[in-house]
């Protein structure tokens, strides 16, 4: 079953039985959106906006109502540029997120994509706490054909990033992709660690383009938002990488993220292959689910 086919089937069933935009239709739509992981507030708000739109614009046909819903959901996701800004040399992208969400794998896939675009990419193994994290990243560096800077397990992450930035400047690298520890659930520790990395970037690459991407597992649904709020408060996020979207029917989490965090989804993981982390396109996403 393809990308969002389950969710598409649910919404298609709803619209295939459509006769008019009456109260029964709106109640069923709200329930469908909640089940799709938009969250209660987002689902209720979307349905209320659709009610108003149907009334004001006299929408009657199934397709007119469906397109009205698409427009509402699209508007929810207009929270920032979905493209990465990596124009300076080097640019730096920090990846954050808890263990098990596919952070290291996402870095490898993005590295491979940038390499195909002709960029010279370096990976920085600053997750020095998780056993074999650097080994895993090194495997991805080999697959993607990228350089990697790493140290011993338990090394200071800031020192690893410093070494990577020095090497990147010396070797004319375009983009540094930096893995970080996923175990820092304590907000104070997380803030201190990220602030330290940020200061090193400020000092070694002043004025460079910088991205801070939070990697989230889509299958965790609304629970993922709890993680995301903590990281948003501490990290100054520029975007989200949403993994394992192919493993869930609950694609509404994309809209919930945009609504609650005001941060765009920049990449969506739709499979295990090296090319299966795709730049996120909001229009294609909405048309895929509605």
Spans of features found by a protein language model:
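Compositionally biased, charge-rich terminal segments
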Residues: 1-4
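Short glycine/serine/threonine-rich phosphate/pyrophosphate-binding segments
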Residues: 101-108, 131-133, 223-225, 248-252
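Primarily NTPase-proximal linker/entry elements flanking Walker-type ATP/GTP-binding cores
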Residues: 6-126, 133-178
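Conserved catalytic-core segment of NTP-binding enzymes
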Residues: 156-171, 185-290
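Non-catalytic, surface-exposed connector residues within folded enzymatic/regulatory domains
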Residues: 23, 44, 59, 63, ...
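Short glycine-rich anion-binding loops that position phosphate/pyrophosphate groups of nucleotides
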Residues: 181-183
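Short beta-strand segments
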Residues: 96-97, 179, 215, 269
């Amino acid at each position: 079953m393809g990308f969002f086919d389950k969710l598409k089937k649910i919404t298609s069933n709803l619209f295939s039985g459509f006769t008019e935009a009456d109260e029964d239709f709106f109640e069923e739509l709200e329930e469908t959106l909640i089940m799709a992981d938009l969250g209660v507030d987002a689902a209720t708000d979307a349905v209320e906006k659709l009610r108003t739109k149907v009334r004001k614009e006299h929408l009657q046909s199934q397709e007119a109502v469906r397109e009205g819903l698409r427009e509402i959901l699209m508007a929810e996701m207009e929270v920032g540029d979905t493209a990465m800004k990596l124009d300076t040399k080097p640019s730096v992208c920090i990846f954050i997120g808890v263990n098990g969400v596919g952070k290291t794998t996402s870095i490898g896939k993005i590295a491979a994509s940038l390499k195909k675009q002709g960029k010279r990419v370096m990976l920085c193994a600053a997750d020095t706490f998780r056993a074999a994290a650097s080994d895993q990243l090194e495997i991805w560096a080999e697959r993607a054909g990228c350089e990697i800077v790493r140290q011993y397990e338990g090394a200071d992450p800031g020192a690893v990033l410093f070494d990577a930035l020095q090497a990147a400047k010396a070797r004319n690298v375009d983009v540094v992709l930096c893995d970080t520890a996923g175990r820092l659930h304590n907000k104070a520790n997380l803030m201190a660690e990220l602030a330290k990395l940020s200061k090193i970037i400020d000092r070694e690459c002043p004025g460079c383009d910088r991205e801070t991407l939070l990697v989230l597992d889509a299958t965790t649904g609304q629970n993922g938002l709890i993680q995301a709020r903590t990281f948003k408060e501490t990290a100054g996020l520029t975007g989200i990488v949403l993994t394992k979207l192919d493993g869930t029917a609950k694609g509404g989490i994309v809209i919930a993220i945009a609504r609650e965090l005001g941060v765009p989804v920049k990449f969506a993981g739709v499979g295990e292959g090296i090319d299966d982390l795709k730049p996120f396109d909001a229009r294609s996403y909405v048309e895929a689910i509605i």
